[in-house]
């Protein structure tokens, strides 16, 4: 057994150095656990940060926005408003549709929210209209969250009604059952129905009314219990031909007798098989289609969900006729997988670059292998903990591991460098490992816990941003902690077995050249440091100027929230004049689709026209533009959007709003543009007064572009002003008037056809093809008290007015949402400040309130907490360092290096044209942890030299700087090269990764140069300060 010199205890590493087999098996267990954990980790774009969101949709065909608001939306809102945990409630009431979106607190489980919503709907049921075709339907999805998959079902030979029927019963239901699917919507509105189009003149000629026809149809088609006969020996179930199944049966239905002769429905109406709603349509690449949008449940694994759907599709399509084609138009997981693959490649590249820089400095293969093992072991071991914490493989956790590459190698480098120094002095490898590891153990612990302390404030960030970066911070902290364990166990053990004087002294021509170069650099640094120490006040002036510059740069740098990603999918809204009909919108979307599909970057296009809840009004259309993969097109998404808007701008009567879909969706409604700002009042009249003023003011701001609002109060309305006295004299009630109008113009669902597989509706309406517009009202006839018929014009006057197309509420009060984008020459911070200044200029009254929504609101919250977040990181690190060093002074010396990192990061972001968004801010916070490592390594050795060798503070810090120059340079370059692949990334998701890389590379470059000189000077300054305090207060003998 090798005899160890006195003092070679090895500290916490001793047991692991002396027991190599146990150490090896322990590390193998960590490696195996990480590999197994990796296989169980789900893949996602970002960590799960969705608010629990539930959407409640109620359809009431024919109802005006005002009726939908008062009769449907308001009763529901009153019940929903009593739910605990509700964060925000928004609603949109339009013609025939009410949509209430409920966003709950992040801490409320979605299942609990679902139970509360169901109870509220049940409580409101008695307050809703009795003739609602269907009760309110809720779904656990965020309507603003883009679908994870879009499929188009087309056929060249079959009617779309048959196609939808098959899709609904054979395909959509099966997809809905897939784990993780929150909602499958069918856009296209071609659900089969029997349509009864009354000939108003024929009905009037026979002395009948539409109400007579409706009553006859509803009475002829029933499906109710009829009982059974229970005899002494046999039981018999009663059935009857009370159901009519086809248009032919309805056509033969007798609705009245005229002079003893039967009047059949076919005599006064056109009865045909058609669509339930003829004012809905969807197109895929200009071909009529049924478009299936699949949305995930909040919290669901998007990759696993999409994979399950794709595995199911071949079996589902086999059940359809050959003429029916199912095409996957978009799959968000394609870009998610590509982004994760690119980040994984950057992670491997970072590992390779770090190992390369280690070899460049050590120029020794055994010495390079040791950290080459420590780095992947630390990263792979992290996967085991990630599984335990229910994390996922996503862009942020992979970015954390990529950055961790530069962090985790630092510990191994510090240990190897210190042990190698003793071996080169002639000590045996085992003794050198014990002595070097024991000497450096406290430094490793200081580095680790001070770095983790920087991440602690990230764990306590509130709301959506805190949820977003929790996985990032914990993953990085776990990797750093495992690295410290590996560096104090495996690394010294391998040094004791793999390093020797011969291996370290063995040099080739390249090694000798590198050694001479490093010696010259160290000598130059020594001369420069001596001059700096002789002129401390000049150096302190530079340090103070750096602090001031960092503050100035922080003030002037453009600020943003989250990078705009290129996911290859563009959401669009097509807006037309408020009086536009369905037919005119269908024609306009064809013109727009033709222009869009001509663009070389566009792969496919789906468009939708009509009111279905998701699309609020007839004068708007939804578009989804799917771009070719990034490597198959020349331009990124913003350039494509600009080109498409230019192409469509020449089409008269339309406005096209486009925005790229994002992985991070905070909004609760589909917006025309990226950012939203709301104006809320207690009454609609107050809104109508202030909306135009604020919109005009916002449109004049250069910091905003594409400003629009959802306020639409110029829709055409026919006001039926009934003379109640005349109507009462004739025995006609207002209910009779409403029913007659509803029967004629509401696409009224008057009866249900039940089959074994589905239910279909009977739709009643007037055939208005020959009498369009207000002239159709002249055909309405009502039954008087004596049984005769009276024209509507006899008791009512028709007035044409303007009316709102939709009525929006936020927390039960009327609201208007302004949508806007930010031009490239401005930042989101500029736009937010400009809006706030405009609001002050307008001097809005007290009953008018404004609020940013969605990502803009989150930006405000994040911006307000950023400074406090950085302060909290610094304070946390000070506390940890103070505890470790048992000193109030030395932590300040270490933290004095931080402004240099801020200056470098902010300058790099400005030069690169990047905003200071939350990704870049995280980079700056990480820099706080990295940069202070330089000071820790210097101060640790200086204190040891003063304590053990009796050196003066100046000699001690000078020697420490020269001895630690090489490991400082090595660790800084390792961290820099770990971030370099992120800065230079060009693939899918690069918008997310580049700000972090830019901030870290810039901060490391500047801080490396400055801290090597400022830290020794500040160390000596505080040493003098400490001596001064001791001389003035001699009773306090404790060391500061």
Curated annotation (Swiss-Prot):
<dbReference type="GO" id="GO:0005886">
    <property type="term" value="C:plasma membrane"/>
</dbReference>
<keyword id="KW-0812">Transmembrane</keyword>
<feature type="transmembrane region" description="Helical">
    <location>
        <begin position="535"/>
        <end position="557"/>
    </location>
</feature>
<feature type="transmembrane region" description="Helical">
    <location>
        <begin position="15"/>
        <end position="37"/>
    </location>
</feature>
<feature type="transmembrane region" description="Helical">
    <location>
        <begin position="867"/>
        <end position="889"/>
    </location>
</feature>
<keyword id="KW-0813">Transport</keyword>
<feature type="transmembrane region" description="Helical">
    <location>
        <begin position="345"/>
        <end position="362"/>
    </location>
</feature>
<feature type="transmembrane region" description="Helical">
    <location>
        <begin position="472"/>
        <end position="494"/>
    </location>
</feature>
<dbReference type="InterPro" id="IPR001036">
    <property type="entry name" value="Acrflvin-R"/>
</dbReference>
<comment type="subunit">
    <text>Part of a tripartite efflux system composed of MdtA, MdtB and MdtC. MdtB forms a heteromultimer with MdtC.</text>
</comment>
<feature type="transmembrane region" description="Helical">
    <location>
        <begin position="909"/>
        <end position="931"/>
    </location>
</feature>
<protein>
    <recommendedName>
        <fullName>Multidrug resistance protein MdtB</fullName>
    </recommendedName>
</protein>
<dbReference type="GO" id="GO:0042910">
    <property type="term" value="F:xenobiotic transmembrane transporter activity"/>
</dbReference>
<keyword id="KW-0472">Membrane</keyword>
<feature type="transmembrane region" description="Helical">
    <location>
        <begin position="367"/>
        <end position="389"/>
    </location>
</feature>
<feature type="transmembrane region" description="Helical">
    <location>
        <begin position="396"/>
        <end position="418"/>
    </location>
</feature>
<dbReference type="InterPro" id="IPR022831">
    <property type="entry name" value="Multidrug-R_MdtB"/>
</dbReference>
<keyword id="KW-1003">Cell membrane</keyword>
<keyword id="KW-1133">Transmembrane helix</keyword>
<feature type="transmembrane region" description="Helical">
    <location>
        <begin position="438"/>
        <end position="460"/>
    </location>
</feature>
<dbReference type="InterPro" id="IPR027463">
    <property type="entry name" value="AcrB_DN_DC_subdom"/>
</dbReference>
<feature type="transmembrane region" description="Helical">
    <location>
        <begin position="968"/>
        <end position="990"/>
    </location>
</feature>
<comment type="similarity">
    <text>Belongs to the resistance-nodulation-cell division (RND) (TC 2.A.6) family. MdtB subfamily.</text>
</comment>
<keyword id="KW-0997">Cell inner membrane</keyword>
<dbReference type="Pfam" id="PF00873">
    <property type="entry name" value="ACR_tran"/>
</dbReference>
<feature type="transmembrane region" description="Helical">
    <location>
        <begin position="1000"/>
        <end position="1022"/>
    </location>
</feature>
């Amino acid at each position: 057994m090798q005899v160890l010199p006195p003092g070679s205890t090895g500290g916490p590493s001793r047991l692991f150095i002396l027991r190599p087999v146990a150490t090896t098996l322990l590390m193998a267990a960590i490696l195996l656990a990480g590999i197994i954990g990796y296989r169980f980790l789900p893949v996602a774009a970002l960590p799960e940060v969705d608010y629990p969101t539930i959407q409640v949709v109620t359809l009431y065909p024919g109802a005006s926005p005002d009726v939908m608001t008062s009769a449907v939306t308001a009763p529901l809102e009153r019940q929903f408003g009593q739910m605990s945990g509700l964060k925000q409630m928004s609603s949109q009431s339009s013609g025939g549709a009410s949509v209430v979106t409920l966003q709950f607190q992040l801490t409320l489980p979605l299942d609990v929210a679902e139970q509360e919503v169901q109870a509220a709907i049940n409580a409101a049921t008695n307050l809703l209209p009795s003739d609602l075709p269907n009760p309110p339907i809720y779904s656990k999805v965020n309507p603003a969250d883009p679908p994870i998959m879009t499929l188009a079902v087309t056929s060249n030979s079959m009617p779309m009604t048959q196609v939808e029927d098959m899709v609904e019963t054979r395909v959509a239901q099966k997809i809905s059952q897939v784990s993780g699917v929150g909602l499958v919507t069918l856009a296209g509105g071609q659900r089969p129905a029997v349509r009864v189009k009354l000939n108003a003149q024929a009905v009037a000629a026979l002395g009948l009314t539409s109400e007579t026809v409706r009553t006859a149809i509803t009475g002829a088609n029933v499906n109710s219990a009829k009982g059974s006969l229970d005899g002494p020996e046999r039981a018999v179930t009663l059935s009857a031909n009370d159901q009519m199944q086809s248009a032919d049966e309805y056509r033969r239905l007798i609705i009245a007798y005229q002079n003893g002769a039967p009047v059949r429905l076919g005599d006064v109406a056109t009865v045909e098989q058609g669509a339930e709603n003829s004012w809905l349509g969807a197109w895929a690449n200009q071909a009529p289609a049924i478009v299936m949008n699949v949305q995930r449940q909040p919290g669901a694994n998007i990759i696993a969900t999409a994979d399950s759907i794709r595995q199911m599709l071949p079996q589902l399509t086999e059940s359809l006729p050959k003429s029916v084609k199912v095409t996957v138009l978009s799959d968000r997981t394609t870009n998610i997988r590509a982004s994760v693959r690119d980040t994984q490649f950057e992670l491997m590249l970072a590992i390779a670059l770090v190992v390369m820089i280690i070899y460049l400095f050590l120029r020794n293969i055994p010495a390079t292998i040791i950290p080459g093992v420590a780095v992947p072991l630390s990263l792979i071991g992290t996967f085991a903990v990630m599984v335990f914490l229910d994390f996922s493989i996503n862009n942020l956790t992979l970015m954390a591991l990529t950055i961790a590459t530069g962090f985790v190698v630092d510990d191994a480098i510090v240990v190897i460098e210190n042990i190698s120094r003793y071996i080169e002095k002639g000590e045996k490898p085992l003794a050198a490992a014990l002595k070097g590891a024991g000497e450096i153990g406290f430094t490793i612990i200081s580095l680790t816990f001070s770095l983790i302390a920087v991440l602690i404030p990230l764990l306590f960030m509130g709301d959506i941003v805190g949820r977003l970066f929790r996985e990032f911070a914990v993953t990085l902290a776990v990797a750093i902690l495992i690295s410290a364990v590996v560096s104090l166990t495996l690394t010294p053990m391998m040094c004791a077995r793999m390093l020797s004087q011969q291996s370290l002294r063995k040099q080739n021509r390249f090694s000798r050249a590198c050694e001479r170069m490093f010696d010259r650099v160290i000598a130059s640094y020594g001369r420069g440091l001596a001059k700096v120490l002789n002129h401390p006040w000049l150096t302190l002036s530079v340090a103070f100027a750096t602090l001031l510059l960092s503050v100035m740069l922080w003030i002037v740098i453009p600020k943003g929230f989250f990078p705009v990603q290129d996911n290859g999918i563009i959401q669009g809204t097509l807006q037309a004049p408020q009086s536009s009909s369905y037919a005119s919108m269908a024609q306009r979307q064809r013109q727009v689709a033709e222009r869009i599909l001509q663009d070389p970057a566009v792969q496919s296009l789906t468009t939708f026209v009509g009111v279905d809840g998701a699309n609020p009004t007839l004068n708007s259309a939804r578009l989804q533009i799917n771009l070719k993969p990034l490597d198959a097109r020349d331009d990124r998404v913003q350039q494509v959007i600009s080109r498409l808007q230019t192409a469509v701008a020449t089409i008269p009567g339309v406005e096209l709003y486009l925005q790229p879909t994002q992985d991070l969706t905070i909004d609760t409604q589909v917006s025309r543009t990226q950012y939203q700002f709301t104006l809320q009042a207690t009454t609609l009249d107050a809104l109508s007064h202030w909306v135009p003023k604020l919109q005009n003011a916002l449109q004049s701001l250069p910091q905003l572009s594409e400003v629009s609002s959802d306020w639409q109060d110029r829709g055409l309305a026919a006001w039926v002003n009934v003379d109640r006295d005349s109507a009462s004299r004739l025995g006609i009630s207002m209910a009779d008037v409403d029913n007659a109008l509803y029967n004629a113009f509401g696409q009224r669902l008057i009866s249900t056809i039940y089959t074994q597989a589905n239910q279909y509706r009977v739709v009643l309406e007037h055939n208005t093809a020959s009498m369009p517009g207000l002239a159709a009202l002249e055909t309405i006839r009502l039954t008087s008290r004596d049984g005769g018929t009276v024209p509507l014009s006899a008791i009512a006057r028709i007035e044409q007015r303007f009316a709102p197309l939709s009525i929006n509420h936020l927390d039960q009060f009327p609201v208007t949402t302004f949508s806007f984008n930010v031009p490239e020459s401005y930042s989101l911070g500029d736009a937010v400040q400009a809006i706030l200044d405009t609001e002050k200029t307008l001097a809005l009254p007290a009953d008018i309130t404004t609020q940013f929504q969605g990502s803009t609101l989150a930006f405000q919250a994040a911006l307000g907490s950023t400074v406090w977040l950085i302060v909290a990181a610094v304070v946390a690190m000070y506390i940890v360092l103070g505890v470790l060093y048992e000193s109030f002074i030395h932590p300040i010396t270490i933290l004095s290096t931080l402004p240099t990192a801020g200056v470098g990061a902010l300058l790099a972001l400005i030069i690169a044209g990047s905003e200071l968004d939350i990704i870049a801010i995280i980079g700056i916070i990480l820099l706080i942890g990295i940069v202070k490592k330089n000071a820790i390594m210097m101060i640790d050795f200086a204190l040891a030299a003063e304590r053990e060798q009796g050196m003066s503070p100046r000699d001690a810090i000078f020697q420490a700087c020269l001895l630690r120059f090489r490991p400082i340079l090595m660790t800084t370059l390792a961290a820099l090269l770990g971030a370099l692949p992120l800065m230079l990334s060009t693939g899918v998701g690069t918008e997310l990764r580049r700000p972090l890389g830019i901030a870290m590379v810039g901060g490391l470059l500047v801080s490396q140069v400055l801290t090597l000189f400022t830290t020794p000077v500040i160390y000596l300054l505080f040493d003098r300060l400490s001596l001064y305090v001791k001389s003035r207060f001699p009773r306090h003998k404790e060391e500061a």
